[in-house]
Amino acid sequence: MSDNVSQLQPQKKPGLGKRIAAFVLLAVLVAGGVAAYVFRDQLNLDALQRYVRYLNVSDDSKSGRFLYDESNSNQYAGLSGGLAVASATGLSLYDKDGTETASIQAAMSVPVLKTGNTVALAYDAGGTVLEAASQKKGSVLHVSSQRAILDADIAADDSICYLSSEPGYKSVLYVYNSQQSLIYRWLSASQYFMRCAVASGSKYAAAAVLGQQDGMFESSVVLFRTDSEEILSTIPIGNALIYDLHFLPGNTICVLCEDALYFYDLDGQCLGSYAFEDAYLKDYTLDGTGSVTLVMNLYKAGNRYTVLTIGYDGTMLGALPTSEQILDISASGRYLTLLTSGSLAIYDQTLKEYDVSDNTTGASSAVMREDGSAILLANGH
């Protein structure tokens, strides 16, 4: 026998009982896997994740409460499972247990708040202050502009852009990468930029332009590559005001106008649209994944609302009529929360009700979280 070959001892075969038990266990696992696939739309995996995540929060604990200075000008948004608050006195961040992790002092007459992945962006609309902060690092960007800040945006990877002006120029677009370093500046001496957006990766940016032709105002969207000195493309919109811009996954840009919602690629080709027809846009959110949420009203006043979710190809995914006053909407991931005068309800993207609570006394705002839970904000907490 060769020295480098080991002699193998014959192994004992497992008993019949053990083999049967192993077979039954395997069958159960296979059946469970098949059931999980077949009924994947009905299984509430987010509920399980929330249960595991919040096991350490007892009913009598104060964990999960967010204490802040209340003001009618406050703006709220979710951040990393916690909360971001922009107020007249600055920007505050809280983790998922309600512990304040950052507090940036800044005077803001009209605070506007947006969040990315780990960074919250707050600025004073029409003022000169912009702040960005994360829960782990605190302040990551401070801008004190000599001219008014007209708009700002933050991408899913925390890239940032904002609009202002400089002497001799009508508009200036500034773009920062995900490490909040300034990488691009576009100066326009001939055009007024009204809105801006930046894509994840900070390779692309966009600005809504208000111009004039034949005595009538004309809107357009200008697309930029931040590694080029030339305009990438210009998308004509027509004589409709542009309310908002937002880059979607795959570098699709969403353009929200006063009369319609559009989706374009970087070449300016329209990928889909949804016309408002005779309804009036009352509120909206471009947050969430896979859809845009619109609150429409049949009249300029009154409570004849219809909540719509629109897919990125312009297809209506769901519609929810309601006669209750809508106080706030918020979206994150696959979920949407709707706060009315009578309840707080959570829906999926097709507006199928997921959960509802009638205990909303004193509530003025709500923040949807990606795991399917929501933060209800009232009376400073």
What are these regions (language model features)?
Residues 1-19:
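N-terminal Lys/Arg-rich, disordered targeting/topogenic segments
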Residues 83, 120, 159-161, 202-205, ...:
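Hydrophobic beta-strand positions that form the internal "hydrophobic ladder"
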Residues 53-68, 97-105, 137-144, 181-187, ...:
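A short beta-strand motif characteristic of beta-propeller blades
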Residues 20-37:
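Hydrophobic membrane-insertion alpha-helices, especially the h-region
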Residues 187-312:
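Acidic, serine/threonine- and glycine-rich low-complexity intrinsically disordered segments
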